[in-house]
């Protein structure tokens, strides 16, 4: 049996649904009493389902735009294209002195209060870009004695800028480096077996290190 409240409404398509919006529109042709009954029984105190805004954007384009907003870091391909990891052969040593002073402050905070194995673990996970290093021992005798500020560290190589404004590359494998922390309060010197650091600095910070035998060079 048809609802008497809808007897005065205009005929609509059988496929169309009656929505609160259509009811409000149709109440314009009802008597005030009929309109009041429709509103009280069909609309009042009921959740109003809002009609979503019309979006003609394709789903694929929407996913790409969302992905582009989420991605903030450069990919490896983009870094290579921009040559961000390319180390110049010649650079100005004086430009990296401030980097070294910042690194000295950083390493003092890292090793503060550490002794024994905890100190070794901290040094193994530390960042060495900015450290002043000297090659103590190496299988390549031509590299022994090279020293400078580390300006780039990769998985297998250390790049040092010497006081002669020359950039030299030292392999981590089969090398022993002397790291110097020279600050007004004190001067720290320690040996670093870089063959145990064959990881990128970012990956090394999350790795759990275990003591390993060191091959004498």
UniProtKB/Swiss-Prot annotation:
GO MF term set: ribonuclease P activity; ribonuclease P RNA binding
Similarity comment text for this entry = Belongs to the eukaryotic/archaeal RNase P protein component 1 family.
Q: Which UniProt keywords apply?
A: Hydrolase, Nucleus, tRNA processing
Its UniProt entry gives the catalysed reaction(s) as:
Endonucleolytic cleavage of RNA, removing 5'-extranucleotides from tRNA precursor
Localization annotation: Nucleus, Nucleolus
Q: Which InterPro entries match?
A: RNase_P/MRP_Rpp29-subunit, RNase_P/MRP_Rpp29_sf, Rof/RNase_P-like, Rpp29/RNP1
Gene Ontology BP annotations: endonucleolytic cleavage in ITS1 to separate SSU-rRNA from 5.8S rRNA and LSU-rRNA from tricistronic rRNA transcript (SSU-rRNA, 5.8S rRNA, LSU-rRNA); rRNA processing; tRNA 5'-leader removal; tRNA processing
**What's the Enzyme Commission number for this chain?**
3.1.26.5
Q: Which of the seven top EC classes does this enzyme belong to?
A: hydrolase
What this chain does, per the entry, is described as: Part of ribonuclease P, a protein complex that generates mature tRNA molecules by cleaving their 5'-ends.
One Pfam family assigned to this protein is: RNase_P-MRP_p29
Recorded protein name is: Probable ribonuclease P protein subunit 1
- Species this protein is from: Schizosaccharomyces pombe (strain 972 / ATCC 24843)
Keyword Repeat recorded:
no
Q: What is the first-listed, main subcellular location in coarse terms? A: nucleus
Q: Does the keyword tRNA processing apply?
A: yes
GO CC annotations on file: nucleolar ribonuclease P complex; nucleolus; ribonuclease MRP complex; ribonuclease P complex
